[in-house]
Amino acid sequence: QRAAQEGLRIKVGRWNVAGKPIVILVDFSTFITQKDEIFASFWEKYKLDSISGQWDYIEPALFGYAAGKVIESFVRFNSSIRQRIIAQFHEWMTGAGLLYLKSAMPQVGCVFTTHATVLGRCVAGNNLPLYSEMKNYVPEELARRFNVISKQSLEKTAAHQADCFTTVSEITATECAHFLDKEVDLVTPNGFENVFTPSEAEWEGKRKAGREKFLQVAQAILGRPVAEDALILGISGRYEFKNKGIDVFIDAMGQLNRNNGLGK
C-alpha cells in the first residue's frame, strides 16, 4: 500500500528456489514519461551520457531507476537507522538504481557486479581479439564504433560510484580495469547450489515434462503435428550470436540436417 501511494507498481511473492526468498517484481513503465527529467538529473549529478541511448538502453536504465526507488521505499518503511542495508546491482542494466540510491539514500551500501563488460561483449561478438589486443583498445573509440556510448557510460559510472565493485572472474577483472578504468574490489566467482539441478530420481520426470513442452512449442511454430519420437535440439541463453555460440549451434544443425545416416 505504501509503495502504491508513492506511485510504485510492484508485486511481491516468493521465488521458487531453495529457501523461497521474497521477490519484488518492479514495473518501470510508469517512469517512461519522466525519462528526460530522470536522465537530465543523472547528467547533472554524475555526467551520465544518455543522449544517444536508444530503447535498448532507456528501458533497462528506467528499470534500474524504478528498482532503486523501490529499495528506497522499502528501507524507509521497513528498517531502522541502526540497520545496515546493502543493495547489490548486477550488470549495467541496473546501474541507474545504484546511482539513484547514491544521491537519495547514501546510507545504503551499494555493490555493483559485472559478469562481463559492455565493450568486452562487443569486441568478442564481432570476432575481434579481446584479451590479446586489449591494451590497444581505446574505450571511448570502441563505444562510438559499436554505438554503445550510453551503455558504456552507465556501466563505467556505476562502477566508479559503487561502494564496492566486483566481478565474477579474474579474466573479467582485467576487462573492468581497462574498459572501465576501475580495478575491482573483489572477485566473486559464480556459483550454483546443488539443488539447482534435479536429483537423479527427479531427472527423468523433468526430462519428459521438458520434452512435452518442446513438442508443444514446435507444433505451435510449425503449425502442424510433430511426431512423438522427433529429434529435438534446443538452445537457450542471452542473445549474443557469437559469444553464446548460436552461430556454432546453427552450423551444427546444418551438418546434422545433411547427414542421411541419422534416421530422423
Segments predicted by a language model, with ranges:
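Catalytic cores of nucleotide-sugar-dependent glycosyltransferases that transfer UDP/GDP/TDP-activated
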Residues: 1-264
